[in-house]
From Swiss-Prot:
UniProt organism field: Thermotoga maritima (strain ATCC 43589 / DSM 3109 / JCM 10099 / NBRC 100826 / MSB8)
Pathway(s) per entry: Cofactor biosynthesis; NAD(+) biosynthesis; iminoaspartate from L-aspartate (dehydrogenase route): step 1/1
Keyword NADP: yes
Self-association and partners: Homodimer.
Keywords: NAD, NADP, Oxidoreductase, Pyridine nucleotide biosynthesis
An example Gene Ontology biological process: NAD biosynthetic process
Catalytic class of the enzyme: oxidoreductase
Catalysed reaction equations from the record: L-aspartate + NADP(+) + H2O = oxaloacetate + NH4(+) + NADPH + H(+); L-aspartate + NAD(+) + H2O = oxaloacetate + NH4(+) + NADH + H(+)
Record comment: activity regulation: Competitively inhibited by L-malate and NH(4)(+).
Binding site for NAD(+): 10-11, 28, 56-57, 63-64, 78-79, 109, 164
Protein name from the UniProt record: L-aspartate dehydrogenase
Gene3D superfamilies assigned: Dihydrodipicolinate Reductase, domain 2, NAD(P)-binding Rossmann-like Domain
Length: 241
């Protein structure tokens, strides 16, 4: 598999380290050269690339997606908070209808998306509570504080890099059905996501506590392995979930 990785932060570097690729291209505006990786000075999708992995930012998703969709590639997107922007969301999916690309949204930092996608037509509402250390939100607080309650769209304007989980859920069931609560807790050194699903099929609750990556406490290693699983599934004859 030949891949193009957009973003050479902690996630991108881990993919290079742990992935099994024939060739790796990378596009990153600030990263230095990495051994074994062909760095692109300008954004493009080389003709031998079969899979594009975005692990940069919601801004990168908005800037490069329409160009990527012109190519017959597998496009894996992590920064799903870009889709909280309704205008971009509508344009993206309009372009996708006639695109030769296939788009994949890994589960990222949470689980339970197999359940959610299976019953999406029966979901009444989803409530997601995210508990984070204040520093990861750019805050300096002394006590546990609810810093936000509301829609995914509203949350994305205040915390654009902390709403990927809620945005992925919104893409599955519809953003209008998702309510977000963000809690900053100084006692926490990791992130907790609690997802509560109410549906005509049943009611479900998932609690995910992620251990931060040693290299970057803001990143969950589960996200890295979620991308690797998606990459393996592209070539596997057996797929679970």
């Amino acid at each position: 598999m030949t891949v193009l990785i957009i973003g050479m932060g902690n996630i991108g570097k881990k993919l290079v380290e742990l992935g099994n690729f024939e060739k790796i291209y990378a596009y990153d505006r600030i990263s230095k050269d990495i051994p074994g990786v062909v760095r692109l000075d300008e954004f493009q999708v080389p003709s031998d690339v079969s899979t594009v992995v975005e692990c940069a930012s919601p801004e990168a998703v908005k800037e490069y997606s329409l160009q990527i969709l012109k190519n017959p590639v597998n496009y894996i997107i992590i920064s799903t908070s870009a889709f909280a922007d309704e205008v971009f969301r509508e344009r993206f999916f309009s372009e996708l209808k006639n695109s030769p690309a296939r788009v994949f949204f890994p589960s990222g930092a949470i689980g339970g998306l197999d359940v959610l996608s299976s019953i999406k037509d029966f979901v009444k509402n989803v409530r997601i509570e995210t508990i984070k250390p204040p520093k990861s939100l750019g805050l300096d607080l002394k006590g546990k504080t609810v810093v936000f309650e509301g829609s995914v769209e509203e949350a994305s304007k205040l915390f654009p890099r902390n709403i990927n989980v809620a945005s992925t859920i919104g893409l599955i069931v519809g953003f209008e059905k998702v309510k977000v609560t963000i809690v900053a807790d100084p006692a926490m050194d990791h992130n907790i996501h609690i997802v509560r699903i109410s549906s005509a099929i049943g009611n479900y609750e998932f609690k995910i506590e992620n251990i931060p990556s040693p290299e970057n406490p803001k990143t969950s290693m589960l996200t890295v392995y979620s991308i690797l699983r998606t990459l393996r599934n592209l070539e596997s004859k057996i797929i679970f979930g």
